Each structure stands twice: as structure tokens, then as C-alpha cells.
């Protein structure tokens, strides 16, 4: 009788709880939203740069027109139309960035909801579950809060810049605005570390 080799069964990973699945989805959503934000930030910086360059050109033309007996009104009208178009485009991009920030806020609220649920299910000093490796659920919430607060301050700064960029005649201030827009002073360099730590903890990145 032919002997059979013993079969080896690869143990299955335990199924994630509903809370763990939501936390993992939230971490992925954070990653995707941050990528979208960076795309919008680069696009809006290019638009803002065009606005500044157009304003510089228009101001130079205004000075030249003072010496001309018959100014070219067509060029003036064309520049104004283009400036209005760029300003509208910049405002639309900012609105898209605000929508991203709103989604980040909702993710943070979801983390808070999971924390509240676990506090109810495991009251007092009762040990609360660790869904992945080492992070308690509260750490996901705290990390999300840190990140969303950075984006909140950044969107407020951008709103201020948008309100003044096309109107100020101070060239140095324009350059400061553009620099702030590109380098996003309220978003700390360690935000990538925070995100990557979250992705590592939830298994989106190999350890």
C-alpha cells in the first residue's frame, strides 16, 4: 500500500475585526488623500506663479503706457481676462484641497468613534485590544489629530494668500506668498514618518 506524505496546511491569518478593518482602511485613505493634496498643491503653486508673473507684466506695461499717447487697450483687457481666469482656477483648486481636509477630519472622527466604543466595551482599567502589532487605538487617533491639525493650519494660510495674492503690489510679499505655498510651513517634515508608521502598523508596509 502506497504511503502518503503528510500534508502541510499554511495557517490562515486571523480575520480582522470590524474596528481593525476600519482602522486599516483609514490608514490607506490617509495615504491616498495626502498624495492628492500634494498634486493639488503643486498645481495650485503653478497657477499662483502665473498670477504673480501676469501681475508683474501688467504693472510693467502700466508704467510703459504712461509714456505712450495711445495705449493698447486690447492687451490690457486680455491680461485682465486671463488674471480673472487664473484666480478662479486657483479658488477652485483651494476648494478641492478643502474637501480633502474635510475627508481627513472625517477619518479622525472615525478613529475617535472607535476609541469611544472601546472605552465603553472595556471600561476602567480593563485591557483594550491591540488590533495589529503594538499600537493602541488611541495612538491612531492621536496621530491622525496631529496630521489633520497641520492641514487645517495650512489651508487657512492658503486662504489668506489667495485673498491677497492678486491684489498686493509688494513684489517681496508676493515672493513670500509663493514660497509659503510651495513649502507649506505648517506641514511638518515628520508627517511622512507619522504616516509611514501608521502604514507599517496596519500592514500596508512590510516590517
Swiss-Prot record:
The keyword DNA damage applies. It comes from the Eukaryota. Keywords: Cell cycle, Cell division, Coiled coil, DNA damage, DNA repair, DNA replication, Nucleus, Ribosome biogenesis. GO terms for cellular component: nucleus. One of its GO terms (biological process) is cell division. The keyword DNA repair applies. Residues 78-99 form a coiled coil. GO terms for molecular function: preribosome binding. It is found in: Nucleus. Component of the DNA replication complex, which interacts with two kinases, CDK2 and CDC7, thereby providing a functional and physical link between CDK2 and CDC7 during firing of the origins of replication. Regulates ATR-mediated checkpoint signaling in response to DNA damage. Part of the 55LCC heterohexameric ATPase complex which is chromatin-associated and promotes replisome proteostasis to maintain replication fork progression and genome stability. Required for replication fork progression, sister chromatid cohesion, and chromosome stability. Homodimer. Part of the 55LCC heterohexameric ATPase complex. Belongs to the CINP family. This is Cyclin-dependent kinase 2-interacting protein. It comes from Xenopus laevis. The gene is cinp.
